[in-house]
């Protein structure tokens, strides 16, 4: 996984962010040289990542935990990327993400868990619940079928179709998964 993190404060000092950009560009060059797909860490950095991909085209990959705009989604897709959707999709309040999951072609989506991070809503414990002693549920790959069911319900299609298409998409994005 390569990319830029525009969210974590200590990674966003001018020096740290410049270093992130330096590493990102170097990693893109390696991916291009060795004809490897990349999994992109896209955290408040989609436009800068897209610029890097236009400057150094690679064979595609996955924009992990995608949470950008429709325009950014289409830009990643046009560059050969699939968009990763996971636990965040399960939250009713994730309106933009849910809208994207319905509006974008299913052929552009892959499912992921980001385990143990980004838990689906059924595992999430609020700060108040955690303060009261409730533990945060542990996200793991076993949650993927339920996340897939959420996507199927949002799109009004079968779980089997979501599973088959997103599996094929993952193999297309990361051919060595075969």
Report each predicted region and the residues it spans.
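Conserved, mostly hydrophobic/aromatic
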Residues: 1, 31, 76, 101, ...
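Alpha-helix N-cap and loop-to-helix initiation/capping positions
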Residues: 11-22, 128, 132-139
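Catalytic pocket-lining loop regions of alpha/beta-barrel enzymes
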Residues: 13-111, 119-122
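Mid-to-C-terminal alpha-helical segments outside catalytic/metal-binding sites
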Residues: 30, 138-178
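Short acidic/histidine-rich active-site segments
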Residues: 107-129, 133-137
């Amino acid at each position: 996984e390569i990319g830029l993190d525009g969210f974590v404060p200590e990674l966003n000092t001018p020096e740290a962010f410049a270093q992130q950009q330096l590493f990102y560009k170097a990693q893109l060059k390696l991916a291009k040289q060795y004809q490897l797909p990349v999994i992109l860490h896209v955290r408040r950095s989609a436009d800068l990542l897209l610029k890097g991909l236009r400057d150094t085209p690679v064979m595609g990959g996955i924009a992990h935990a995608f949470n950008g705009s429709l325009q950014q989604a289409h830009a990643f897709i046009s560059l050969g990327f699939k968009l990763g959707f996971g636990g965040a999709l399960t939250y009713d309040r994730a309106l933009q993400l849910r809208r994207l999951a319905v509006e974008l072609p299913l052929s552009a989506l892959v499912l992921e868990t980001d385990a143990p991070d980004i838990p689906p809503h059924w595992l999430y414990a609020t700060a108040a619940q955690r303060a009261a002693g409730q533990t945060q549920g542990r996200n793991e790959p076993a949650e993927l079928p339920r996340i897939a069911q959420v996507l199927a319900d949002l799109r009004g299609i079968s779980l089997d179709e979501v599973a088959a298409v997103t599996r094929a998409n993952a193999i297309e994005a990361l051919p060595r998964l075969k």
